[in-house]
A protein has these predicted regions:
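C-terminal transmembrane-helix exit sites in multi-pass transporters
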Residues: 38, 94-119, 245-265
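Hydrophobic/aromatic residues within transmembrane alpha-helices
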Residues: 17, 27, 31, 78, ...
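Helix-helix packing/entry segments at the starts of transmembrane helices
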Residues: 30, 87-93, 161-183, 217-253
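Hydrophobic transmembrane alpha-helices of multi-pass small-molecule transport proteins
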Residues: 39, 62, 68, 110-132, ...
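Hydrophobic/small/kink-forming positions within alpha-helical transmembrane segments
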Residues: 8, 65, 69, 73, ...
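Membrane-interface interhelical linkers
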Residues: 1-5, 19, 36-63, 76, ...
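Glycine-/small-residue-enriched transmembrane alpha-helix faces in small-molecule transporters
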Residues: 1-30, 66, 70, 74, ...
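C-terminal-most transmembrane helix of multi-pass membrane proteins
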Residues: 28, 32, 129-131, 205, ...
Length: 290
């Protein structure tokens, strides 16, 4: 629960920076660099882990970091066009996309529950796409496409973590650290080697940047690893439904976003589709361990 709630606070710390005129690449640069520094120090000083990696691991991590960073950019960019709760709910279709990608490229079977899940998620996305007074205008369409693009990129990242052999024995915390560290490359390039980096001129902005690196990034990633070990991946994934719910609550409570029947119904349909993916029977006839 803590993992999902922490990750769902992304908009809480990102939106004040967006409203202050800070660009998406600058926001994510601060998030990733603070997270990398804190995470690296934590691994080295507290966990006493070696940070050494092989050349094959380096190449794989660069590729994964690119996917992860682009997913972050598109998600945060979508906050500028549509409600944050809608953005995070659209992101939550990624388990369905993982199932489709795995079926197409790795010949995993699409059973009836997966097809039903995809239909449910698609209907939920359709309802969410019709929310708000400006539904259908260019701004809304752009935001929806950005959020869905973020979900696709994150799904590709998940598949990559699962399928890329060089990183199969890499500890989770080392994987997370290098994905964030190498992910900085995207923002450094987009900011023209930081010449376009916007400064943080108030304590509030510094606090938001630091908390963005700590709560929805480091704490979320660390508690996710612990949760999987304690209760298994299935229960952890089910509780992940609290992530878009948290984002919706943040949007309504802090940013005056409206909660309509379409948003509620779309949220339930998307989450239902995800739960069907998570708890569907495996090849041995039982749900995944957890």
């Amino acid at each position: 629960m803590l993992t999902a709630i922490c990750y769902g606070t992304n908009p809480l710390f990102a939106m004040p920076m967006i409203l202050a005129g800070i660009g998406t690449n600058s926001i994510l640069f601060y998030r990733y660099i603070f997270a990398s520094l804190i995470y690296g120090a934590f691994m080295k000083l507290v966990k006493k882990h070696s940070l050494r990696i092989s050349l094959r691991e380096f190449v794989a991590l660069i590729f994964l970091a690119l996917l992860f960073s682009l997913s972050s950019i598109t998600l945060f960019a979508s906050f500028r066009y549509i409600d944050v709760g809608v953005s995070c709910t659209l992101l939550f279709v990624y388990p369905s996309l993982v199932a489709v990608i795995s079926a197409i490229f790795f010949h995993e079977k699409l059973d009836g529950s997966v097809i039903l899940a995809i239909c449910s998620s698609t209907l939920g996305v359709s309802l969410l796409s019709l929310t708000g007074e400006s539904a259908g205008d260019a701004m809304s369409v752009r935001g929806i496409l950005l959020a869905l693009c973020s979900a696709l990129l994150y799904a590709l990242y998940i598949v990559g973590v699962k399928q890329m052999k060089p990183i199969q024995r890499l500890p989770n915390d080392k994987l997370n650290f290098y994905v964030m560290l190498f992910g900085l490359i995207v923002y450094v390039c987009n900011l023209r080697f930081c010449s376009d980096l916007q400064g943080l001129h108030t304590p509030l902005l510094w606090g938001c940047a630091l908390l963005l690196a700590i709560i929805p990034t480091i704490i979320s990633l660390e508690t996710l690893t612990v949760a999987i070990k304690l209760i298994g991946s299935t229960r952890t994934s089910i509780l992940g439904a609290l992530e878009p719910l948290t984002a919706i609550i943040v949007g309504v409570a802090f940013f005056g976003e409206q909660l309509s029947w379409r948003i509620c119904t779309g949220f339930l349909l998307v989450v239902s589709g995800v739960l069907l993916i998570i708890v569907r029977p495996r090849k041995n006839g039982v749900a995944s361990q957890g």
